[in-house]
């Protein structure tokens, strides 16, 4: 399907993601296999953004990174506390580990490219992440500080924000009946993120302890 769309110029690239099937290594190997076939068997030259699976062997992530343009590890929620509340099977440490590995591999690859000829590129478009907003009580101020820290510590190219959309009732989640997706809030965070990435604004210059929300 991807190659049919690509040949007809319907698409210029592919975003490939997956939930964990059987195990992180099994899932990461499946993602690698898809990318390998696209690049080497079908000569796909388009843009590929692939997800790295937390808990997968670093060798699998490395092999996949040489076939992708961008790689992402979703941080899921703004804080470790929220992650423990809503996704206790996941840990912040487990999520940040592949993010750090991709950063280190990218830095090493940049050095190799400058030193040697014909070195394959590792995720040349960098890495990104995504966090869900509105499912937990963090303020815009807290969320921007998390994003700012991720940009600094992991050399991220983008942080994506996804407005929480309730689909079922859960005592730990906002009510399906009362909660609307915070789309305006998502939009404001993207605007603030743009100011931080392109104009060098700090989170503390956009919001403060006394004013923690863009909608107040």
What are these regions (language model features)?
Residues 1-129, 134-137, 150, 168-178:
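Conserved Radical SAM active-site core
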Residues 11, 108, 156, 198-205:
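Intrinsically disordered or highly flexible coil/loop and linker segments, enriched in small
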Residues 80-83, 161, 193:
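Generic secondary-structure boundary/loop-capping signal
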Residues 111-117, 161, 201-208:
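Flexible, glycine/charged-enriched surface loops at secondary-structure junctions
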Residues 129, 140-184, 190:
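A conserved active-site cap/scaffold subdomain adjacent to cofactor or substrate pockets
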């Amino acid at each position: 399907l991807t190659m049919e769309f690509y040949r007809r110029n319907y698409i210029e690239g592919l975003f490939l993601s997956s939930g964990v099937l059987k195990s992180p290594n099994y899932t990461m190997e499946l993602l690698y296999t898809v990318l390998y076939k696209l690049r080497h068997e079908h000569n796909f030259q388009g843009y590929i953004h692939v997800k790295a699976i937390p808990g997968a062997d670093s060798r699998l992530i490395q092999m996949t990174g040489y076939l992708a343009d961008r790689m992402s590890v979703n941080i899921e929620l703004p804080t470790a506390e929220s992650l423990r509340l809503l996704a206790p099977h996941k840990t912040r440490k487990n999520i940040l580990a592949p993010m750090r590995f991709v950063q280190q591999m990218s830095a090493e690859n940049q050095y190799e490219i400058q030193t040697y000829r014909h070195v394959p590129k590792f995720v040349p478009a960098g890495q990104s992440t995504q966090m869900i907003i509105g499912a937990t009580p963090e303020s815009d101020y807290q969320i921007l500080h998390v994003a700012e820290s991720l940009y600094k510590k992991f050399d991220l190219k983008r942080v994506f924000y996804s407005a929480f959309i309730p689909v079922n009732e859960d005592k730990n989640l906002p009510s399906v009946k009362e909660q609307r997706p915070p789309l305006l809030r998502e939009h404001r965070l993207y605007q603030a993120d743009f100011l931080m990435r392109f104009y060098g604004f700090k989170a503390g210059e956009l919001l403060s302890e006394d004013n923690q929300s863009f909608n107040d």
